[in-house]
Amino acid sequence: MKAAELARLAGADHGSALAARGQIAELALAARNASAPRTAVLRTAEPRSFGSVEEYARFLAGRTVCLTLLAGAGSRWVASLAAARERGDGRPFDPTRPRGLYPVRDFLTTREGGGAVPIAAYAIAATRDLGRRVIVVRGWEREIEAEILEPIDQAAAGHVGERTFFEQEAPFGKPLGHGDAAWQCRSLWAGAEYVVANFGGDANSRRTILSSLLALDALCACGQEADLLIPAARVPDPAYPIRLDEAGLPRDFGHAKLRGHAGASAGASFGYTNVGVRVYRASALLGWVTHFRSRHWVPGEGYSIPGNDAAGKEFALDNVDAMIAADGRARILAIARPEELTPAKSVDDIPAFERAVESVVREDRAP
């Protein structure tokens, strides 16, 4: 039974998921179609079947918001720009511009990496046609439109899709985390069925995101109690380790930034880590961002969340993930490739990022 197989791959048999990476979308399609009679009775999803993965994806795109968070300049990024200038390398770049606009090799509109596109173009392209876009920014909307969205439109011989820019407020001089960003823009995604969250500096794979979205919907249609699916990669010494229980369900997510520098597991061998992509049931995400805002917001100060770095005053999506996992309603799908865990957080990261996106885009283009 396809539903049981999909549930195993997102649970106890998580170690087999990567080998099935290329079949996950078809498996989710088969599981969803098999669930149609069940959903008609239980009303857990719209009771219909689909003739292809493409048809299934188009159906879900109408019920999904893709929430892409584009970072501002950031102190680490600005420092790396200054260091590159002192060394006489790196590309000329205004340090007040967002990191996501920094030019890197273009594998999206060319196959050889000729020309340049901004870093964030890869995250934007990875959610192409998967839902309505909400792009969280700190200004620079005109440049993002002209330098990222319009070129991707032209390369796709179509359009990136409906999109809305949202500027995250920074009440105390700095943004207070991506969880706070999700809360601030909640009116733009609360009416959706699913929210795909990703970040503008990551080497995202469209195949990973599509497979994860379809898998969560199929699991929900089959009666699985899941509010979050995180595509994961198996890597040595993960900085953001995922702890699984005996059933293969995630119970804890390590996050060094939130916990000071004590969050990472020192000396660990191979383990699972997230690659910066999350797929939520929108209703669950809305409930949890509202919970954190109402329970942990201190007027005039920021967030005070137990377990977080007290000095940061931030609210992260990782906090939401932890609560969903504690309720047993999170799943991992260990289909992500290690290349997807190659973010561009400093100028020194750019060569590795370019190698990673070349590999990721090549696979996404393959049949």
Residue ranges and their predicted role:
Residues 2-146, 163, 168-173, 209-211, ...:
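N-terminal glycine-rich phosphate-binding loop and ensuing alpha1 helix
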Residues 249-366:
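Catalytic-core segments of class I nucleotidyltransferases/pyrophosphorylases
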Residues 70-73, 168-169, 198-201, 232-234, ...:
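Fold-independent oxyanion-binding glycine-rich loops
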